[in-house]
From Swiss-Prot:
Subunit comment: Component of the mitochondrial large ribosomal subunit (mt-LSU). Mature yeast 74S mitochondrial ribosomes consist of a small (37S) and a large (54S) subunit. The 37S small subunit contains a 15S ribosomal RNA (15S mt-rRNA) and 34 different proteins. The 54S large subunit contains a 21S rRNA (21S mt-rRNA) and 46 different proteins.
SUPFAM superfamilies, alphabetized: Ribosomal protein L16p/L10e
Gene name as annotated: MRPL16
Gene3D superfamilies named among the record's database cross-references: Ribosomal protein L10e/L16 (3.90.1170.10)
UniProt family annotation: Belongs to the universal ribosomal protein uL16 family.
Gene Ontology MF term list: rRNA binding; structural constituent of ribosome
Protein name: Large ribosomal subunit protein uL16m
Amino acid sequence: MFPYLTRMNLSIKMGGLTLKESSPNAFLNNTTIARRFKHEYAPRFKIVQKKQKGRVPVRTGGSIKGSTLQFGKYGLRLKSEGIRISAQQLKEADNAIMRYVRPLNNGHLWRRLCTNVAVCIKGNETRMGKGKGGFDHWMVRVPTGKILFEINGDDLHEKVAREAFRKAGTKLPGVYEFVSLDSLVRVGLHSFKNPKDDPVKNFYDENAKKPSKKYLNILKSQEPQYKLFRGR
């Protein structure tokens, strides 16, 4: 049915799969199947799992997860209260930043957020009941102090980064601030924290002083008579 498949050579290259035909064939010659390995604001799911509305988390324990720069030199951080941001809003801010990143040498933009909550809506003046509404768009819950974007480049100046993030902030709801590697970590609306001031805790040293039942069981499981009965 497909005689040309026996004469086809497959060669995998970086960034995609290239199909090469030994005989002159206009359809298969130099045909490339593009593969996308980039960040996506709208996941391409065939079946969208509906979510509850939920609330934006309020961090009260001083957590700094996602609030520090991990890849670039400069970043954009949420300063106001936690908000919900849609995928379309993040994409508009992304486009505004990329206008300044593309001319840079080895310029790169890191996107720290992933829109993982499906928003479903129902029409206006709709009666109660009869199930949840249909899928409309993707969104993400962003708590206070969260890093949204990071940029870096060989010839990136701080003024250029500030202007890029300023324009990106106008596309997004909420109030944002410019951060660098020397900036303190925001853990609340009016509180900051320096991660270097936190003492480094060792799990084994702390449990050795006052061992718990769980820690004693871990030590006992390392004895040879118990290793014989593993994987049964």
